[in-house]
Design a protein with these regions (language model features):
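Charge-patterned, long linear interaction tracts outside catalytic cores
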Residues: 224-235
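N-terminal cysteine/histidine-rich coordination modules
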Residues: 1-87, 92, 96
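Short helix-coil boundary/hinge micro-motifs
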Residues: 1-8, 35-38, 144, 160-173
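Amphipathic alpha-helical transducer elements in NTP-driven molecular machines
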Residues: 29-36, 69, 130-133, 156-159, ...
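Signal for well-folded cores of large energy- and translation-related assemblies
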Residues: 44, 113, 121-125, 140-141, ...
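Short basic, glycine-rich beta-strand/loop surfaces that mediate nucleic-acid
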Residues: 170-215
């Protein structure tokens, strides 16, 4: 697999995995932070979702963080989304009337899932992906996996064997899930994919970030992260 460095989606780099860019030999830049409009907490942008208000007053999700206008930031958690909608917090943060879709939570979850699948497809085209039980085993042994993704409907036997190997060769390797084998397969141009290894670098970091945000939106209490550390929203 080819190792990929730099932001996976063309945006500014985040804080996960890697020491960050240095200028003039100084300290690595700290990850940008924003305040969540629901909790009031100041958090790294990696844990937040950006929204903007369109000229007609409608609320627009901006998960890619590229739309013009003042950003409204919300932690990527199901309870934060529910609170923001129920308490009219988008309008309060924007200091104007805001039209919020009734199905905003569903829309944002769909967009977050699409970002995960699209990024996985980009990683495949960049040569940063291996898929299949034997290929993933070989890549793990060679130290060529920065993120392990397993299908939500993977058989327990195969899942446990891959996780046992990951624990043995890379105890800190994140092991995540976010969809079934069929959806993984579509993103990778094949019928199905159960075990997927992502090369260390920008794609592994970007996918881990997006999958964790998606899990938070779904109210996930546990990811298949027996190998890596738990993250915000997995409580």
């Amino acid at each position: 697999m080819a190792r990929a460095d730099g932001p996976a989606d063309g945006s500014q780099g985040g804080s996960q995995g890697g020491s960050g860019h240095r200028r003039g030999g100084g300290r690595a830049a700290e990850a940008p932070q924003r305040r969540c409009l629901a909790s009031g907490r100041v958090l790294p942008k990696d844990q937040l979702l950006r929204f903007v208000v369109a000229p007609d007053g409608s609320l627009v999700p901006d998960l890619g963080e590229r739309l013009p206008g003042r950003g409204l930031w919300l932690q990527a958690r199901q309870d934060m989304m529910a609170a923001a909608c129920a308490k009219n917090l988008f309008a309060k943060a924007a200091k104007r009337q805001v039209r919020v879709p009734d199905d905003l939570a569903r829309q944002v979850e769909h967009l977050a899932l699409k970002r995960c699948l699209d990024l996985l497809g980009l990683a495949r085209r960049a040569g940063a992906v291996v898929a299949g039980f034997e290929k993933v085993k070989a890549a793990l042994r060679a130290g060529e996996v920065g993120l392990l993704i397993q299908a939500a409907d993977a058989a327990d036997d195969g899942r446990q064997k891959i996780q046992a190997l990951a624990r043995a060769v890379a105890p800190q390797l994140p092991v995540l899930q976010f969809c079934g084998a069929a959806e993984l397969g579509v993103a990778l141009g094949r019928e199905a994919a159960v075990h997927v290894g992502i090369a260390p670098g920008r794609f592994a970091e970007g996918l881990a970030r997006e999958i964790r945000r998606l899990a938070g939106l779904r109210g996930a209490t546990v990811q298949i992260n027996e190998v890596g550390r738990p993250t915000e929203g997995e409580r």
